[in-house]
Amino acid sequence: MDLLAELQWRGLVNQTTDEDGLRKLLNEERVTLYCGFDPTADSLHIGNLAAILTLRRFQQAGHRPIALVGGATGLIGDPSGKKSERTLNAKETVEAWSARIKEQLGRFLDFEADGNPAKIKNNYDWIGPLDVITFLRDVGKHFSVNYMMAKESVQSRIETGISFTEFSYMMLQAYDFLRLYETEGCRLQIGGSDQWGNITAGLELIRKTKGEARAFGLTIPLVTKADGTKFGKTESGTIWLDKEKTSPYEFYQFWINTDDRDVIRYLKYFTFLSKEEIEALEQELREAPEKRAAQKALAEEVTKLVHGEEALRQAIRISEALFSGDIANLTAAEIEQGFKDVPSFVHEGGDVPLVELLVSAGISPSKRQAREDIQSGAIYVNGERLQDVGAILTAEHRLEGRFTVIRRGKKKYYLIRYA
C-alpha cells in the first residue's frame, strides 16, 4: 500500500487537488510539504493532532515536512469555519504563543533524519518585513475580488460581515505557500478540511506567478464524534497537548472514554498501529466490547505519543488506583493529577478528628450526618474504609505529608491539602 492509499485507508484524505498527479509525485520523488498552525492560544490541542501526525506519517515515508507557525497570520485571524470576527491578539501575546507552539511541534517530528530532516518555520519572518505596496503589487494583483468572494470562508460571512483584515487572510496564506515553494521547493500543502479555500488560493498564486502547476493540496477531514458533540471538548473544557493545561491522566481518560462507534476511526487517525493490528482490535470490539481493548490501545498509544512512556505509566497507575480504591500507593504528583478537579479543602493545623474534618471540609453537612456516614461504612480515607466515629487523622494519614484523599460513598472524592 503506497502512502496515499494508506492515508485513504485511515480516512485521512478529505480532498486532493489532483489525486493521480499527487500519487505519482509521492511515489517517484522525495516531496517537501508543509502544514500551518496559527497560534490562537498558548498550546495546541487535540483538534490539531490529526494534521501533526499526518506530517509525521509523510516523514516516516521518506518525505520532508515543514511545520509552519503562523506568527504573522495569527495576528490577522483565519475566518475559515468561524461565524464571527476573531478578537485580535496583541503582538507580544502571539509571539509568546508562537514560541510555545514551536516547542510542542518539535516533539512530533525528526529534525536529525538522514536525508529528510523536518523544519519549523515562522511566517512572521517573511510577512513581517513585507510593506503594503509590495504586498498589493506582488500578491494582491493576482487575486480578483470575485474569486475571493466565491470562497466558502468568505461566503459564510457575507450576512454577518467580514472585515478587510480577515478577508485578506487567504492572500497571506497563499503567499506562505508561494514563499515555501520558492525557498524550500515545497510542492504540497496539507491542512484541515476548512483550509481547502486557502490551500487552493496558494496553488492559484503559484500558477499565476510561476506559470506552472506543479504544486498540490490535500485536506484532512474534520474529526467528528458519533454522538454529535464537538471532538476535543469535554465538560471541563478543551483537551490540550500541554500537560500543564490538560494533565496526562485527563488526556488518557479522554481517549479511554471513546465511544465504541468512534474508536476504530480514531485508531486509524491518531495511532501508528498497522492495518492488521487495528483490524484485530476491531474484531475484538465486535466479539467482546465490554473488554474495551480498542479504547485501551487508543489511550495508551496517543498518550505515549504526546506525553511519553513515563507519563503514560503514571496515567495508568492513577486510573487503576481510582478504580480499585488503592490510593495509598500513589505519589503526591499522581494525586495532584488524578484529583485535580475534585473538591478540595485546606486544613491548617495538626491532628484532627475525622468527624470534625468531614463537616469543616463540606463532605458531610453536620456532625450527626458525619457520624452516620462513618458508622454505615460510607467513608474511606486514602482508600481504606474507616468506621470508627472516634477516629483521629494524624500525620500517618497524610500521603507524602501533603494530602489525604477522602471518599464518601462510591464515587464522591475530596482532597484534603495541608497548609
UniProtKB/Swiss-Prot annotation:
UniProt-listed Enzyme Commission number(s): 6.1.1.1
First-tier enzyme category under EC: ligase
Alphabetized InterPro entries for the sequence: aa-tRNA-synth_I_CS, aa-tRNA-synth_Ic, Rossmann-like_a/b/a_fold, S4_RNA-bd, S4_RNA-bd_sf, SYY-like_C, Tyr-tRNA-ligase, Tyr-tRNA-ligase_bac-type
Localization per record: Cytoplasm
Catalytic activity: tRNA(Tyr) + L-tyrosine + ATP = L-tyrosyl-tRNA(Tyr) + AMP + diphosphate + H(+)
Residues binding ATP, per UniProt: 233
SMART domains with a match to the protein in the record: S4 (SM00363)
Start and end residues of each S4 RNA-binding domain: 352-419
Record note on quaternary structure: Homodimer.
Family membership noted in the UniProt record: Belongs to the class-I aminoacyl-tRNA synthetase family. TyrS type 1 subfamily.
Known role: Catalyzes the attachment of tyrosine to tRNA(Tyr) in a two-step reaction: tyrosine is first activated by ATP to form Tyr-AMP and then transferred to the acceptor end of tRNA(Tyr).
UniProt xrefs under HAMAP family: Tyr_tRNA_synth_type1
Name of the featured protein: Tyrosine--tRNA ligase
UniProt source species: Geobacillus kaustophilus (strain HTA426)
